[in-house]
Each structure stands twice: as C-alpha cells, then as structure tokens.
Amino acid sequence: MFKLFSAFRKDKVWDFNGGIHPPEMKTQSNGTPLRQVSLPQRLIIPLKQHIGAEGELCVKVGDRVLRGQPLTRGWGRMLPVHAPTSGTVTAIAPHTTAHPSGLAEMSVIIDADGEDRWIERDGWSDYQLRTREALIERIHQFGVAGLGGAGFPTGSKLRGGSDKIKTLIINAAECEPYITADDRLMQDCAAQIVDGIRILAHILQPDEVLIGIEDNKPQAISMLRAVLCDAHGISLRVIPTKYPSGGAKQLTQILTGKQVPHGGRSSDIGVLMQNVGTAYAIKRAVIDGEPLTERVVTLTGEAVSRPGNVWARLGTPVRHLLNDAGFCASAEPMVIMGGPLMGFTLPGLDVPVVKITNCLLAPSASEMGEPQEEKGCIRCSACADACPADLLPQQLYWFSKGQQHDKATAHNLADCIECGACAWVCPSNIPLVQYFRQEKAEISAIRQEEQRAAEAKARFEARQARLEREKAARAERHKKAAVQPAAKDQDAINAALARVRDKQRDAAQPIVIQSGAKPDNSEAIAAREARKAEARARKAQQQAASVETPSTDAADPRKAAVEAAIARAKARKAEQQAAPVEAPVAEPVDPRKAAVEAAIARAKARKAEQQVAPVEAPVAEPVDPRKAAVEAAIARAKARKAEQQVAPVEAPVAEPVDPRKAAVEAAIARAKARKAEQQAAPVEAPVAEPVDPRKAAVEAAIARAKARKAEQQAAQPDLASAAANDDPRKAAVAAAIARVQARKATQQAVNEE
C-alpha cells in the first residue's frame, strides 16, 4: 500500500485557483527549427539587463573587444555583461532600452568587425570535481541570469538557497500565448538542457528534481523523455495547459502542493526554480566556457512573413530581427516584447535585445482587434475569479486609482504577478495591470524616499552622538588638565585678597579735613594755566605772523627755550636740596612777609634786567633772550630758596596765615613779573627771531604751577594737634574763596598785560 501511495504521489499534480484559457497561437512559430540571424553592424548592450545594480565599466571608447569579453565587473547582484561579438567600442552613452517606461539607460555601443572572434574559452567538463562555490562564481561571472522573464542573477539565487533546497524545479511550462522559445529549445537542445540540470543538481544537492511542462508541447516532451531515460533523480511532470501555470508560485503549487507564503520566497519552503533556457546557459558557461552572449527569441505575429525562433545576439536592434523575419511595417507599427498578456509595447524599433527578451510579437490590425473604450467597473467579480494569486483586483483597482497606497499594500498588491488574467476577463475593458504596475512603482518610490530619509536621520543622529562624545572627551581632557594652584601661588592669592580688604577698610574710614589747610589743587591750576598760556601763545603767534623778520641771524628760540627749561630744572633741584637743611631748628617767620619779600626780589631782578637792556640798545649787537631768561630763572630760584629757608618750624604755635591775602599778593607779584618780562623782551625784536610762544607759555605755566605748589607746601603749618578743634568746613570754604580770588587776580593781571 505504501509503495502504491508513493507511486501515485510521484506522478500527482495539483491545481491552483483561477486561471484562464486564452487562444494559444503557438503553431505560428514552433514548427521550424532554430536558426541563426545575420550579425548586425552595430550592437547596443545595456549595462543593466537584470534585477539589481549595473556593473562597473571595464572598457572605454576606442577599445577593441572580442566576443565573450567582459564589458563590466559585477559583485553581489551586479551582474556583468559581455561583448556579443568582436569589434570596437564606439560610444558609451544612454540609449532607450527594453522597458515599459521607455527610459534611456547607459549602454555600450560596439561596431562589429564581422570576424566574430571569441576570447579564449576554458570549459570545465569535469565540473563534478569543482567546488560548489567555484561553480556558482563561474556562473555569476559569465553573466547568467534568469531567462524566463524575471532576470534575477542566477549565481545570487543559487548562493542564497543552496543549504535548504529540497526540491529543484525546472520550469518548462511556457504558458503564455504566441511564445515558443523554450518549446523549440527543448526540441533542438534537450541534451544540453539536461546537462545544465545536472550541474544545478550537483550544486544544490536536492532530494528531487522536477521538470514541469504543459501538455501542449508533445515534441518537447518526447525529446526530454528520450534524454532522461537513463537519468536518475530527474522526473518529468506533464501538467494541464492553463494560464498562468508557468508562474513560479503557481508551478510550485502544481508540482508540490505547497504554497509560497505571503511576502516570502519559494526557498522558504525548500523549493528553487530555474528556467530551461537558464539551464542551457549554465551548461554553456560551465562546460563550454562561453559567457551569455545570445539567447533564443520568438519572432511571431501576422505582421511577419517568416515567423519562428532565432538565435539573437544580445544588443541586436529589434528592427534587425524583424527585418530578418520579413516584417511588414504599417503606418503605425506596433511591436510587443513578450506575450500579449504580460508583454509591453516597445517605444521604438531601435530597442536592443536583452537577456529577458523571449518574444517579439508583431500583430496585424485584425489580429489585435480594435481598441476598446474603458468603462466603469460593474463589480462583477470576474477578475477575482480569474486571479491565480487569490487577490481582489477590483479593490486594488479602486485603491490604485484613488492613490490609497496603504490600503493597496494591505490588500497584498505585492503578490500580484501581473499575469493579465484579470484584464483579459474584464467586461469593462479596464487595463487593470497598468494600474497595478503604476501603483507598485509609486509605492516603491515612496519606500525609497522613506529609506533615504531614515538613512539621513541615522546619519544625523550618528553625527550628533559623535559630537556629544567629542564634547565629553574635550571636557574630560580639560578636567584632567586643570591642576590645583601651588603653595606660592596660593600665598600670592591670599596677599592680593588681603590688599583688597585693606583698601576696602581704608575707603570706609571718614575723611577729616584739617583746619587751616588748603587742598592741593596744583594740577587743576596747572591745567588752567596751560590752557590760558596756549590761548596767549596762539594770539602771539597770530600777531607774529603779520610781522616780517628782517634778519636771519637771531638766536634759535627752541634752543633758548630748552636751555631755560634746563636752568629752571636745576634751580628747582637746588631748592629741593637746600630746603630741609635747617628746617627743624629755624625760627618761625611770617609766611606773608616772606612771600612779599620774595616777590619784591623777583621784581627787582626784572627791573635790573630792564635797566640793563636799554643801555645796550643802541649797540648793533642783539640781546641774547636765552641769557636773559636764564638770569631771570636764577633770580626766581634764589628767591624761592630764600622762602624755603625761612619756612615755619614752630607751626603749632604760629598764628594761622590768611591764605586769601597771601594768594592775592603772590598773584600780583607774578603778574608784575610777567609784565616786566614782556617789556624787556621786545628790545631787539626787529633783529631777533621770535621764540615759539606756545612752548614758552606752556613751560612758564608749568613753572608757575610748581612754584605755587611749593609756596603752598611751605605756607601750610603742621596743625595735626589742633585739627580736632577746628571746623573742617570753614577751612574748605576759605580755601575755595582763596582759589577764586587768586584766579580773579591772575585774570586781572593778564588783562593789564
């Protein structure tokens, strides 16, 4: 009983829901053997002829290539492409390719030299001695992809499911109408196909190998049975003709009774599927050492006079193949790449043949019928009954038309195999597959954008984390670099803090003004005197500018001013040295009397200078103003020295001096002295060059200010013991009044001058 059940299960096939039975139209092209097509003059080889990214170019314009020479390098899902013939690379540029969008893709354009020379081919007839990895790598580098229409890299497919495959299925169903490429290949090359199947079985080591073929291919079935009569482990399963039984999920269910899970792959249930054309290409790559450079293409339709199946080089323009088949182009020719249900209309006839091109259908106008107007959906559910994937096409149609991407995804739009069965049975002539393709493209674009946004966010977050780590590292370095101050540094800091506290304590103490003391306003007085001197100097300069100087033999005024300043400085130094000699023991002298006597002495000295000056006036010799200034300075120095010598010693018992009267008398004396100097100066004016009045005035003002400061210091008694009984406010008021009166006397003296 168990053997009977096993034998029954061995030949059993299952069925799938849905499906249709359209007219097959295969007899137009499957009756003639495969033939070669003449080599075109120019071939266009797109760099991307598979699912995945295009490879890296390894040729450039002007290079000479041989047939089978790699044009790109490929890793992972980047599948290399090879030169289909020998010739010269004339261009590497975008070109329209075989895609429903009609977009241009980067392509290598080769001008054939007609020699069709191969590269050196190295076949592995002893492939059983090769490792699985070496065989998979050879298949990948020789550019083998799925030739059934998907174009998935075969090497990647074998590498991904090599450890868990229990059943290897060879798809020989070829269910779509008009297409007979696999049928004719099995009739003419059955032995090579079986060799390719054995290579796959050697790589995958499955428990069983199944070949699924529809019962509408009797010649191919007989040829395969003849080759498989002595083969072990390979079973041929003939299945009923039903569209789309050639779909991967549908054929898997038919042969094994298992369904591929939603969102999964056939390898999840231990099944791997390859096309018969792919098996043939694997045999040529491994045993013959020939990369994939050509494939079988069906040329059919009522618009061609010689339909059939041909060996077409990859990159051959569609126009060249159709012309070889006797294509009769109409005013608006329509050529479909693929079958009438899953194919697409080509944007032009210069599109090249690629690895997934299995059929070129050129129907006549009567064969395709008149285009029908699209009408509204009547919800008849005919599309749902015909769907082999158990979907709801009418709901997907509404979601796709309304841009409801989330709902379309929730209704498993990704499981649609785009077989066209729903559109075939639709009574409203709605092109459902077109809506589904567009919706898939939009969802894919949205997901790519979301992925890019997620990657950008991840990069931003990684950057922020890196910046935070760097900031923390810098802070840690700064923390480690910071050291405690040394003992001497701490001592210096403590000393500075103590000085600050002392200053604050001193600043907080009240200020006590001593009775009878005058504030030291010498700097302010000097500044005022300097401003007045500058004004007088500007006035004198303006007056001197209007007078012409008849002689150039006069003395240099700058030199005279310098010498006078030096003399005054020496006199002040002598005064400072002589002042404190006998101060502690000298008898007290009335400072007013001393000031008056000093003023009288200065006046007499100036008068003597004035008397000497007129005596020499008649003489032609000019008076030296520098000498006169020096003598005057010496006289003033002697007067100050006399004043300092008679400075009060016993200030605590002396009567306080009236500062106002002393200041007035001193101002009057200075005014008279300046007047005497001005009267004596112009004796030789006609012959002497004028001294720089601004410098002289400034120096004179500074000298007077310093003399006044010395007088104030000498006149101020030491009243430290009596300061407690005097009123400081009265003393400050008296000092201010004295300053005002002195300023007034000075202004009057200037006006008199």
Swiss-Prot record:
In residue numbers, the region (Disordered) covers 517-561, 606-625, 640-659, 705-735
Q: Per the record, where are the segments of Low complexity compositional bias?
A: 610-622, 644-656, 712-735
- In the UniProt record, does the keyword Phosphoprotein occur? no
Might you report a single GO cellular component term? plasma membrane
What the protein does? Part of a membrane-bound complex that couples electron transfer with translocation of ions across the membrane.
User: What top-level class of enzyme does the UniProt entry assign?
Assistant: translocase
- Could you tell me the keywords of this UniProt record? 4Fe-4S, Cell inner membrane, Cell membrane, Electron transport, Iron, Iron-sulfur, Membrane, Metal-binding, Repeat, Translocase, Transport
**What GO biological process terms are annotated to this protein in UniProt?**
electron transport chain
Q: What GO MF annotations does this protein's record show?
A: 4 iron, 4 sulfur cluster binding; electron transfer activity; metal ion binding
Q: How is the cofactor bound?
A: Binds 2 [4Fe-4S] clusters per subunit.
Biased composition, class Basic and acidic residues, residue ranges: 526-537
Top-level division of the source organism's lineage: Bacteria
Report the HAMAP family cross-referenced here: RsxC_RnfC
Q: What is its main location?
A: membrane
- 4Fe-4S ferredoxin-type domain ranges (all copies): 367-397, 407-436
Task: Cite the InterPro entries for this sequence.
Answer: 4Fe4S_Fe-S-bd, 4Fe4S_Fe_S_CS, Ion_transpt_RnfC/RsxC, Nuo51_FMN-bd, Nuo51_FMN-bd_sf, RnfC_N, Soluble_ligand-bd
The record's listing under NCBIfam families reads: PRK05035.1, rnfC
Membrane topology summary: Peripheral membrane protein
Protein name as annotated? Ion-translocating oxidoreductase complex subunit C
- Give a Pfam family name: RnfC_N
| Cofactor(s) needed by this chain | [4Fe-4S] cluster
